[in-house]
């Protein structure tokens, strides 16, 4: 038990040291997401890979070995978890869009102009096309680096120390706080919102806990990290589509209360369902 705790602490320390070390130059240099120079952009390009590197270094330094990385896919009898990992982000996003624009119908606007398509049709095409075309690419451009660390190492290590539900909560909090330098530089929510940047860190951390519930469950049930990687990648891709289109809003809005799935309104179904998984974790993670 003592060794397992040391491994968790060492992994978290290495992850934050490496990641925040890469972010230090642009972060303390006063740069933002929109004003990065080339060296800063190159440094931040490695940020998402640091959890994977930390997991490998922790295994090496504690003589843990490299089995159980979670990379071997298990398809037979587990295919539904891959489908869930792929499709759930779309469901969460559509539910968020529906509720957000039901609450604020006057805000809906599309900046892209396709006269032959209605706005709702174009939105559906953007969401579906992003999932089909971009998710497979996004998996290998940073998401796999995160998942090798968070679900491939931290989550199963925490499961040795506590229940899967609490492991999901703890790893989700760590995952959310890990994004702090990026949030301070304007990722996800920009720079102009009440409580910047700590309100942004808090909202993203809450969303990360909900995502951690889903990705932890997918990892437990599938026996590998790939369904969780698809889920994580899907959320990233859909969030990016929303930011490119200004949350599909033609009026000013609070970024923490936007339409994309990493906000308090757009992410309502992610948050509610993630909370439900945590409440039922004793049964769900065991497959009952």
What are these regions (language model features)?
Residues 16-24, 90-98, 173-182, 233-245:
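Aromatic-anchored segments of alpha-helical transmembrane domains
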Residues 60, 194-200, 231-288:
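C-terminal membrane module of polytopic membrane proteins
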Residues 21-66, 79-90, 107, 111-134, ...:
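Alpha-helical transmembrane segments in multi-pass membrane proteins
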Residues 24-33, 186-189, 245-250:
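Juxtamembrane "helix-exit" motif on the non-cytosolic side of transmembrane helices
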Residues 1-13:
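N-terminal membrane topogenic signal
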Residues 13-16, 49, 86, 90, ...:
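Residue-level signature of the transmembrane alpha-helical core
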Residues 183-196:
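Membrane-interface interhelical connector segments
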Residues 144-177, 216, 220-224:
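Membrane-interface helix/loop boundary segments of multi-pass membrane proteins
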